[in-house]
Each structure stands twice: as C-alpha cells, then as structure tokens.
Amino acid sequence: WEVIDAAKSKPFGFQAFYPGPGLGGHCIPIDPFYLSWKAKQFDFRTRFIELAGEVNTNMPYFSVEAVANALNKEKKALNGAKILVLGLSYKKDIDDLRESPSLTIIELLQKRGAIVSYNDPYFPTVGQGRRYALDMTCAPLENLQQYDCVVIVTDHSDYDYPSIVRESKLVVDTRNATKGIDSPKIVRC
C-alpha cells in the first residue's frame, strides 16, 4: 500500500491498481484468458497472463486463510465462528455481483464451518445465482460484538470504518479500508 501511495505521487503517467481479495466484474477475470486461449492457436505462450490469473483466482483462499489465522491468534476456531462479511459487490460503491470474490469467500467460510452473515448497502438480499445459492439477507451493522470477526471484502464509501473497528472484536481488512486506523483488532491482508 505504501509503495502505491509513493508511486501515485508522480504527477503524470501512473494508474494505481490496488490489491484485494480477488478480481471481479464482467471483463478482467475473464477476458485475459480469452487472449491466452487465442494466443495458443498461434503457438504463443502467455505465461504471465496465466500466472496473474492463478494469483487472482487464489486470493479468496488466501483471504479465508487470513481470517482463520486471525481467529486462531484469538484462540478461536473458524469452524463455528460467527463472521460478518462487509461488501458483496466486486468493487466499491456499485451493485454488481458478477464474479465477485465476496461470494467465493462466503462459500469457502461456510465450507469450513463458519456461520456467515453479510452487510452491503447495495444488496438487501442475495439468492440463487449462476454459481452460488446463498439465500441470505443483509445483516444490520448493529451489535458487531456478536461476530467473532468482521471481514472487509468491499470497501464501500458508506461504511464508517473507525466505528466498525471500535465496535468489533476482530477485523480482517482485505482492501486497506482501515488505513490510518491504529488498532490491535485489525489484521490487514
């Protein structure tokens, strides 16, 4: 994060790209693989595209592992833990779930025995999708102490991050949304 901040201080010729829990949307997670497939038809290798895709595909797994490790440090298992996922959309301040890493993260957490709720101001409910059948309703941002961990997956501008950190037992931040907030409760991944 600090390297990106330094690089974007350049007055021209820099486009910041921020790491997170995985890629989403209608083009970035899919289109490079089309290019790779097409290149193979002409006997070209696109190893860098494939490596980037591999890293991006594994980020939800990395994020879930960060949650499990953060809970373990608090002497709490992921199995049976109450988790609140903040943000469903694939990027901040939009209502688009296409290829969202949040859905994969929720599914992975549930498969490991976590009791998962979500909050997203753009999605009062989420149900059957192309790949996921979550059938969930947006949980209010009240009584955050009931959750063993709050996971920031989408950094919507509507969220009051200082308040979320203050009221939570543990926060895993996958988007650097808590930048500038100093608390032992925060785990940044």
Language-model regions: role of each:
Residues W1-C189:
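Structural/interface elements that position substrates and couple domains in central-metabolism enzymes
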